[in-house]
Amino acid sequence: MITQRQNDILNLIVELFTQTHEPVGSKALQRTIESSSATIRNDMAKLEKLGLLEKAHTSSGRMPSPAGFKYFVEHSLRLDSIDEQDIYHVIKAFDFEAFKLEDMLQKASHILSEMTGYTSVILDVEPARQRLTGFDVVQLSNHDALAVMTLDESKPVTVQFAIPRNFLTRDLIAFKAIVEERLLDGSVMDIHYKLRTEIPQIVQKYFVTTDNVLQLFDYVFSELFLETVFVAGKVNSLTYSDLSTYQFLDNEQQVAISLRQGLKEGEMASVQVADSQEAALADVSVLTHKFLIPYRGFGLLSLIGPIDMDYRRSVSLVNIIGKVLAAKLGDYYRYLNSNHYEVH
């Protein structure tokens, strides 16, 4: 453990370095730390010996090491902090007409990326926790049809498919009936399980040839098992990391898995400093924050950036955007669930 004065010195060096990205000397610290320059230098040397500070090659000043940033995050950073100066700018950025859920999630991701200069990722509610609350099949022609699904009574998912060659109209009706009887109102996790267990047995009762029917089930419902991911500022990753991080961000499903793994069960927020199990994120910092999507569950708002980021402001922005987004979503879902009257 370090002393209170050493902790104050480390915190101040982190604050000054993230603002200027210049090594910090004892004279700069003396303006805030009420100790002699010699005492401060001695404490800085001890912090360096502990691996929390690093000596700059071009000056006598010190800068935080990755371990120093991590210590600061774990012992001094408040994950619920908010800087009131950013509230107005975030609210103003959200002043737009949203026509669907995806509009708001994409906008929030862009706002966070633009205000930080880093990479932002937003995830919808985890697929396994969503429920299938509506299903229909619309025949578009003699050869293709559209499966129209509703998740959580509000999120539409459509899948266009070619009607199998041996299908008759009654076969499409049977397909829909099986879904309504066996899968409707179940969670996506239940659907995944039933497609491997119950459905193959049920299909045998309705169809002579079952192979293409089971393939159709897999094709139509595979969309439900995918994460809905919104990435903004991907090219920014090239300024604080290497090409592997940039390429990793192209694999949105793997990005979603890694971000969810970084948040422990029951946690609402976390900050990982060069601590991700994913190799492409091992040398960056990842801030993750859960936000409420009314009536449906929690989404995930993440910021990926350099180890030497301004953590206080980044955490503040993540918190503000999460709160404003949740409020915006609350208005959106209240509107969807209310009676709508045309105004003349």
From Swiss-Prot:
Domain of life of the organism encoding this protein: Bacteria
Any single GO BP term: negative regulation of DNA-templated transcription
Keywords assigned: Repressor, Stress response, Transcription, Transcription regulation
One example GO MF annotation: DNA binding
A Pfam family reported for this protein in Swiss-Prot or TrEMBL: HrcA_DNA-bdg
Transmembrane feature ranges: none
Matches recorded under NCBIfam families: hrcA
Functional description taken from the UniProt entry: Negative regulator of class I heat shock genes (grpE-dnaK-dnaJ and groELS operons). Prevents heat-shock induction of these operons.
Family per similarity comment: Belongs to the HrcA family.
Name of this protein: Heat-inducible transcription repressor HrcA
Protein species of origin: Streptococcus agalactiae serotype III (strain NEM316)
